[in-house]
């Protein structure tokens, strides 16, 4: 291989797209979470890989939104006319700081307009970095942008809620969120419950209280094994996600 060509190959970065199913309590498919990771790619691109051309910090999110639309449309086109509709809840993981970008907000609204025509629902899943780290102007911008998304029919999820700490301070406002994803591995939930029945009771009361005070739906996230599955089913969760139910797949 010529040196110049070899350098180009080594400098290639590609996005790897992943999808994992989210189930209802009755084990029916509710939706899926889709995300991407950038990786240095030194071989020809295979399924699930896409060359990343831009060094823009939010380029990954733009590519994920494009992939979601293409994936949703291809599933609909491939499905027989008499088959049940594909799960219409499409969660996209992103940082809170991404909500500061007006262009990305427009891109999400445009994506939702396309998906809505095919009965699909975009759900940005905002990670649990503390809202307290933003200044007042940034907080107002994030809140305004969330309202813009919700005005266009986009539901919002909070990703990474930890039952072992006061994660509610990171939520900005309960009224802004439609879903809260509870990470059951963050606090070693099964070990904490085994060591303290009081921790289980407090966790149960915490979720029950938030459900009573709002219309939020809760997702038990990262249910990786049977012990966590058993505990999750004994809590007031609406939906379930993790390797116990389905592997993460390349798309």
Question: Model regions: which residues?
Answer:
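Surface-exposed amphipathic alpha-helices with a cationic face
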Residues: 112, 142-153, 204-215
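Short, well-ordered coil/turn segments that N-cap beta-strands
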Residues: 85-90, 117-122, 152-155, 176-178, ...
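Bacterial c-di-GMP phosphodiesterase EAL domain
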Residues: 2-115
């Amino acid at each position: 291989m010529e040196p110049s060509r070899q350098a180009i190959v080594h400098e290639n970065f590609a996005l790897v797209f992943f999808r994992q199913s989210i189930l209802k309590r009755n084990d029916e498919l509710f939706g899926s979470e889709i995300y991407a990771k950038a990786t240095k790619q030194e071989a020809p691109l295979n399924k699930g890989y896409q060359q990343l051309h831009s060094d823009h910090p939010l380029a990954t999110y733009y590519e994920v939104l494009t992939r979601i639309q293409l994936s949703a449309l291809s599933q609909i086109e491939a499905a027989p006319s008499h088959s049940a509709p594909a799960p219409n809840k499409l969660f996209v993981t992103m940082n809170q700081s991404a909500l500061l970008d007006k262009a990305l907000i427009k891109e999400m609204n445009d994506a939702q307009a396309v998906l809505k025509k095919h009965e699909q629902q975009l759900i940005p899943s905002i990670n649990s970095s503390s809202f307290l780290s933003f200044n007042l102007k940034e907080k107002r911008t994030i809140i305004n942008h969330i309202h813009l998304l919700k005005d266009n029919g986009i539901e919002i999820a909070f990703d990474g809620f930890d039952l072992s700490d006061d994660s509610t301070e990171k939520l900005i406002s309960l009224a802004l969120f439609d879903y809260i994803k509870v990470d059951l591995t963050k606090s070693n939930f099964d070990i904490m419950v085994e060591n303290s029945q009081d921790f289980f009771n407090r966790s149960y009361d915490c979720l029950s209280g938030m459900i009573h005070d709002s219309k939020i739906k809760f997702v038990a996230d990262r249910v990786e094994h049977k012990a966590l599955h058993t505990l999750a089913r004994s809590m007031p969760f609406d939906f379930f996600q993790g390797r116990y139910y389905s592997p993460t797949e390349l798309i």
